[in-house]
Regions:
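Short beta-strand immediately N-terminal to the catalytic nucleophile in serine-hydrolase-like folds
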Residues: 143, 265-267, 291
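Glycine-rich nucleophile elbow surrounding the catalytic serine of serine-hydrolase chemistry
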Residues: 267-279
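Cap/lid segment of the alpha/beta-hydrolase catalytic domain
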Residues: 138, 143-254, 297, 301-303
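Bacterial N-terminal signal peptides
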Residues: 11-22
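N-terminal targeting or regulatory segments adjacent to alpha/beta-hydrolase or S9 domains
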Residues: 23-125, 134, 155-159
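Alpha/beta-hydrolase fold nucleophile elbow
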Residues: 258-269
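Mobile cap/lid helix-loop segments that gate and shape the active-site cleft of serine hydrolases
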Residues: 290-337
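Short beta-strand-to-loop junctions in surface cap/lid or active-site-entrance loops
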Residues: 126-137, 146-147
Length: 337
């Protein structure tokens, strides 16, 4: 049997193999359903930073402040001292989404950070808001960040396309690879089911304000953190994307169609990490759906299989603080887990 491949097909096959082998190494490490390895160390309620073990809710409140500070200092980087968001443009994309069962709006948000008293740094991104039309009163909402631009996440020709498009455009083998790697509902949510169950859906493409690329991402993080002088604890994109979730909620609290006390975050992989981060630092969120959040997310640094601190910080130097990278090969030294 004789096979013939064009140069384009050979290149596509090579890219597919690289994507898949990287995916196996980084995101498909198997997990034992009955693990017997040690738990988190130090224990969340045990002695920590010279403090005795937690014995009541009041002591837990004090402990949680210490833990959040430690995660900023050693893993994710430091959050802004002050920040906020405002809607600078809003338009109705369609009032007949899903055969008239929902309406779709596009909001442009301007968000800002301040790491000192003198500097204010801004960025903008678009938010899609799909709300059911035949439901009385404010509705609960699922808020998600995705790998694909908004026009790929909710398919409607009226949705704005970001400059440069995105990795989810096109047809053929690479589009198939994207779907295979990320799954049906990672990039394109089950919108009809969400709306039919009485939920609203809001989605954003976080690469609009912090690109998921090493050089471009680090440059954006630097611009947004002007006023922060310690490069070792400058925030990474996981913290910035998580912060972005909170800025969306700043806007949603004034949205009459949304019950801002019932907003649930959703994210896969890196955006699962961001969703967990956001919920840990912002108590306004009602819940989190973090799918395969892995290292730097729900997985422990110590006693784990698959992706290590060294693996993830070398492959994605923009995701975490530079301080986290210093724990490569010595995960037991990370003060929190």
């Amino acid at each position: 049997m004789k096979f013939s491949f064009s140069p384009i097909r050979l290149l596509s096959l090579l890219i597919m193999l690289c994507v898949m082998t990287g995916c196996v190494r980084l995101t498909m490490a198997w997990a034992d359903l009955t693990p017997d390895r040690p738990g988190a160390s130090p224990a969340a309620l045990g002695p920590f930073d010279g403090k005795a073990a937690v014995k009541n809710p009041e002591e837990w409140h004090e402990r949680s402040v210490l833990l959040r500070d430690a995660f900023q200092q050693h893993v994710y980087g430091v959050l802004p001292e002050r920040s906020g968001a405002r809607v600078i443009n809003r338009r109705l994309v369609t009032d007949s989404l899903l055969d008239g069962r929902a309406q779709l709006e596009e909001l442009t948000l301007e968000v800002w950070t301040s790491f000192d008293s003198d500097t204010e740094n801004t960025a903008t991104f678009n938010l899609l808001l799909a709300t059911p039309v035949d439901v009385d009163g404010p509705v609960p909402l699922i808020l998600m960040e995705t790998f694909c631009p908004n026009h790929n996440t909710i398919l409607h020709p009226g949705v704005t396309r970001p400059q440069g498009g995105g990795g989810c455009d096109g047809e053929g083998i690479m589009a198939d690879v994207m779907t295979y790697v990320f799954g049906r509902y990672i990039a394109t949510p089950p919108l009809a089911e969400i709306v039919d169950r009485g939920f609203a859906l809001a989605t954003l493409y976080p690469s609009e304000f912090v690109p998921d690329q090493a050089d471009a991402g680090l440059a954006a993080l630097s611009r947004l953190s002007q006023g922060h002088t310690d490069d070792m604890t400058r925030w990474g994109s996981i913290a910035a994307w998580g912060w972005g979730f909170s800025r969306v909620l700043d806007v949603l609290v004034s949205e009459p169609s949304v019950d801002a006390e019932r907003v649930v975050l959703y994210g896969h992989s890196r955006y699962g990490k961001a969703a967990l981060f956001a919920a840990a630092y912002d108590v306004r969120f009602a819940g989190v759906i973090a799918h395969q959040s892995g290292t730097g997310g729900a997985a422990l640094n110590r006693h784990k299989q698959g992706e290590s601190v060294g693996d993830i910080t070398r492959a994605y130097p923009h995701w975490f603080s530079r301080q986290y990278a210093t724990y490569a090969g010595r995960e037991e030294a990370v003060p929190v887990d």
